[in-house]
């Protein structure tokens, strides 16, 4: 009898699936989601739009109206093209697949977004992690040395970084781009609505840079839409490994509709930026808590015992992310999403119990 062990790659057999906990009944502050629903009139209008979507037809592979709207709203340079993905996760997988030549490597600062390493492993690429400094800032000298030593195919720079919230200095990013002449530098701006800084306007100035974004953190995590901006010479190659019809018709219609009303989402992002400042101050005042600077919609917090804090919050029905085992630099760290005022109040009340 044939078994999975006879067929599946050994490295895949040794892996575990990406864990997504059941959040039913919890204050959900573990996944950097926008806590705000659409205003009722806008939600009703969206429902009316979606009711007329042709569900019996395959989606357009390059929906012109949606791409034009993305260009207009985000200021995509005229010389750049746009490639859509089923979330940025799919785009990361496509990049790895397209670049998976024998001996090719992927390089990124660590701790960082886990999908950079996972996608490299799935494509059988070597992943090179360059540790941040102890204060979780970028070690530019180590990055430049690693670029010279490994000459990776792909270099990921999360701007800002997840899970640390670090926003790397522009001059360091420029030095990395210049040093990565043999690489493609992918600047991941998933949290741009909260960082208020971007490399997208400069995407056409470099022949080895693409900028990746997602609609998820802006408030549309449920529709799964990511997009890659870069020179056509790059995007035409990545498009070859894109699954046909990868972005469904409901996602396309919802994204186009909401980009026409992006001021609502932008206002929500502004609320969360203000709440981030207040929440960081309040958590930082608790005994034993150290809050790291963040340019995302989340805070990284070091506590005396991350596992104990996580367990107390679970008891209080507040779900956060215990990242303390992800990397040695994250010892006793938890990551909390900035939520609504009510959610933040619940979080603070639970943290006061965990950090008396």
Swiss-Prot record:
Residues bearing N6-(pyridoxal phosphate)lysine? 217
- CDD domains, per database record: AAT_like
Recorded catalytic reaction(s): these are:
L-histidinol phosphate + 2-oxoglutarate = 3-(imidazol-4-yl)-2-oxopropyl phosphate + L-glutamate
Q: Which family does it belong to?
A: Belongs to the class-II pyridoxal-phosphate-dependent aminotransferase family. Histidinol-phosphate aminotransferase subfamily.
Q: What is its EC number?
A: 2.6.1.9
Is the keyword Iron-sulfur in the record? no
Top-rank taxon:
Bacteria
Q: Needs which cofactor? A: pyridoxal 5'-phosphate
Q: What class of enzyme is it?
A: transferase
Q: How does it assemble?
A: Homodimer.
Kindly provide the name given to this protein in its UniProt entry.
Answer: Histidinol-phosphate aminotransferase 2
Question: Which GO BP terms, alphabetically?
Answer: L-histidine biosynthetic process
Q: Does the keyword Plastid apply?
A: no
Please state the pathway this protein functions in, per its UniProt record.
Amino-acid biosynthesis; L-histidine biosynthesis; L-histidine from 5-phospho-alpha-D-ribose 1-diphosphate: step 7/9
A molecular function (GO) term: pyridoxal phosphate binding
InterPro entries per the UniProt record, alphabetical: Aminotransferase_I/II_large (IPR004839), HisP_aminotrans (IPR005861), PyrdxlP-dep_Trfase (IPR015424), PyrdxlP-dep_Trfase_major (IPR015421), PyrdxlP-dep_Trfase_small (IPR015422)
């Amino acid at each position: 009898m044939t078994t999975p062990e006879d067929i599946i790659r050994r490295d895949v057999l040794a892996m575990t699936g990406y864990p997504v906990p059941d959040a039913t009944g919890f204050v959900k502050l573990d996944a950097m989601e926008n806590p705000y629903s659409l205003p009722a009139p806008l939600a009703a209008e969206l429902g009316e739009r979606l009711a007329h979507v042709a569900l019996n037809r395959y989606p357009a592979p390059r929906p012109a109206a949606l791409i034009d709207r993305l260009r207009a709203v985000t200021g995509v340079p005229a010389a750049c093209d746009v490639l859509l993905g089923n979330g940025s996760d799919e785009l990361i997988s496509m990049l790895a697949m397209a670049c998976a030549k024998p001996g090719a490597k992927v390089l990124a600062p660590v701790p960082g977004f886990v999908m950079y390493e996972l996608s490299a492993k799935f494509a059988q690429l070597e992943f090179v992690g360059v540790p941040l400094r102890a204060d979780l800032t970028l070690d530019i000298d180590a990055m430049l040395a690693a670029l010279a030593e490994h000459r990776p195919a792909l270099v990921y720079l999360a701007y800002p970084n997840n899970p640390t919230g670090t926003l790397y200095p522009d001059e360091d990013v420029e030095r990395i781009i210049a040093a990565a002449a043999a690489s493609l530098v992918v600047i991941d701006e998933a949290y741009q609505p909260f960082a208020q800084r971007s490399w997208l306007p400069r995407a056409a100035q470099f022949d080895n840079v693409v900028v990746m974004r997602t609609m998820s953190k802006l408030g549309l995590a449920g529709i799964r839409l990511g997009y890659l901006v870069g020179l056509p010479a790059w995007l035409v190659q990545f498009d070859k490994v894109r699954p046909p019809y990868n972005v469904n018709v409901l996602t396309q219609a919802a994204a186009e509709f909401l980009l026409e009303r992006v001021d609502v989402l932008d206002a929500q992002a502004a609320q969360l930026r203000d709440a981030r400042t207040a929440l960081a101050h309040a958590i930082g005042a608790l005994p034993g808590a150290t809050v790291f600077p963040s340019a995302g919609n989340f805070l990284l917090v070091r506590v005396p015992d991350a596992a104990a804090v996580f367990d107390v919050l679970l008891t209080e029905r507040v779900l956060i992310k215990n990242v303390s085992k992800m990397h040695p630099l994250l010892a006793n760290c938890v990551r909390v999403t900035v939520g609504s005022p009510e959610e933040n109040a619940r979080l603070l009340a639970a943290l006061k119990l965990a950090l008396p």
